[in-house]
């Protein structure tokens, strides 16, 4: 730990700690249905679904919440690099495949198609995540598309102002940075209304603040984005 002190504010440099527990996820109308989807995922009769939302919206966070809730239940992440997925399915009750929007080859489509079929054949839970809706995925395998369209889906929408403010504060807190309310308000008026946009600007502010040994302030932010 390293402590820096200028004339206006004491700042403490500490490693970034991303809060990924259930209570750390910021819930409002833009993502409430997705949170309920995850909370109830393993309780549903048909345990197959897709969590859809823009980059940086917290899909991995919610997947982490699900995994932590599965006490005594075997689960595993799957990737298209796995060679023996049949044995992986047999050894686990819940399988997770993230970022299917990045599947851009026939080999990866075949892997996903086979995984969906195995989840049905072996009665295993299967959770997929994607930053694009199924209709926007450029898959060539029509049978795969039809299977995806038949799955339960939950959506996370881009943040409104209330969620934006809470997200900014959380991301600063993850980095152990204390920021005044007027600084948060100033930042909100000047950045892209997206999860990824918020994450990227907070990352930049953090790096500049540390490199210049300055506290996060309106003056520092203004120099970066105005």
Each PLM stretch: what is its role?
Residues 88-129:
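Conserved nucleotide-sensing/catalytic segment adjacent to the nucleotide-binding pocket
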